[in-house]
Amino acid sequence: MKVITAFLSVFVLCSAEDDDKLTVASNDLGMRMLPLLPSSPGENIFFSPYSLSIAMGMAYAGAGGETRQELHENLGYSRAGLPEAEVLDAYARQTQRHLSDPSNTTVDVANTAAIHLGLPLLDEYETILRNSFNADLQKVDFVENGQGAVDVINSWVKDKTHNKIESLFSEPLDPLTRFVLLNAMYFKGTWKTEFQKRRTEQRSFFNGGVTQAQVDTMIGKIRIRHNSFNDVGVDVAELPYRGGDYSMVILLPQEKTGVEALKTNLTAGLFKTLLDRLVQRQVTVFLPKFKFESKYSLKEILQNMGIRRIFGGGADLSGISGDTSLEVYDVVQKAVVEVNEEGTEAAVVSAVIGGLRSGSFDGFEFRVDHPFLFFIRDTRTNAILFVGQVNHL
């Protein structure tokens, strides 16, 4: 009998074909960011490297000089082997896949740019937003009608996330704000094999790997891809959604308090290796139901990852409007997730905000009863859409 008791779960977008370079860059960005996000035994993590990559891609499109070079290096394009000249074409291909690729799982991706009335965009930048990101433009007044501007943004966010995220901003932005580049993504997937509600029962989950709590736990005997990796100290299960295009991958440390060490050592390469070594088998899965949201200001984290120039000190975003005095103030992301017997529903919005400088079962078991990581992925492109860490339920 194999028992898995804590987990890291990842929602990933993956393909049977080789990873494209933009996907490699996005996944690498997510794995490097995961250990830098604030975490505690009483605080969960949920974010989307995929959404962040798209929002930052729209900023990259307007960057020049050393600012663009720094973004190219630290957004993962360089280490993925994606030349500067091919980045925007890669986003265009990714956008086209979303527009033309049907699936049994709902994945809606939308982009927009909220632009201050007094900021004339360069024609070339407008063309890039439309062709590479299918982004629409919304003219707002951050100076004279700041509340109206955030109302427009929040309304767009609510619509594109199917009402899962009702607002991103609670108050007007700085009057010096000149642009907000936004990506929103909504995900709804039904398990290939749904859990029966009548089998859901109260079972133990060890919050922080230590404190025992009773939580609603789904139980099902399911044919999934699964394996144990004693050399890494982790058990892994991949739960497919209907249609097979998307899956949830759960990384469960073999030690109840091992999620932080797992998170620190996890890389995109190791993640792929673990997936490649999974075996199809019948497994009794114990998975807690959960629902939570998160919101992050990512400026400091991105700076720690090497992205500094865009936030001031010589930022070159002249490709947006020709104005050399633009910089990014912050990058924020808000995400929500719910996992239950039917499947998973998740939504995320990422925003790049910028403006003028101021001064006991038979067989195998997978028992998720302590902190874990989870990933939602596309099984066709290997892109990791969402990453989460559950510490407390």
Curated annotation (Swiss-Prot):
Keywords: Blood coagulation cascade inhibiting toxin, Glycoprotein, Hemostasis impairing toxin, Immunity, Protease inhibitor, Secreted, Serine protease inhibitor, Signal, Toxin. It is found in: Secreted. GO terms for cellular component: extracellular space. Residues 1-16 form the signal peptide. InterPro entries: Serpin_CS, Serpin_dom, Serpin_fam, Serpin_sf, Serpin_sf_1, Serpin_sf_2. Glycans are attached at residues 104, 265. Disruption phenotype: RNAi-mediated knockdown does not affect time course of blood feeding, feeding success and weight of fully engorged nymphs. Induction: Induced by blood feeding in nymphs and in the salivary glands and ovaries of adult females. One of its GO terms (biological process) is immune system process. Saliva (at protein level). Expressed in salivary gland. Expressed in ovary during blood feeding. GO terms for molecular function: serine-type endopeptidase inhibitor activity; toxin activity. It comes from the Eukaryota. Its main location: secreted. Serine protease inhibitor that modulates blood feeding of ticks on vertebrate species. Moderately inhibits host plasma kallikrein (KLKB1), matriptase (ST14), trypsin, plasmin (PLG), thrombin (F2) and coagulation factor VIIa (F7). Slightly inhibits host alpha-chymotrypsin, tPA/tissue-type plasminogen activator (PLAT), uPA/urokinase-type plasminogen activator (PLAU) and coagulation factor XIIa (F12). Slightly inhibits the extrinsic pathway while not affecting the intrinsic and common pathways of host blood coagulation. Belongs to the serpin family. Interacts with human KLKB1. Interacts with human ST14. Interacts with human F2 (thrombin). This is Iripin-3. It comes from Ixodes ricinus.
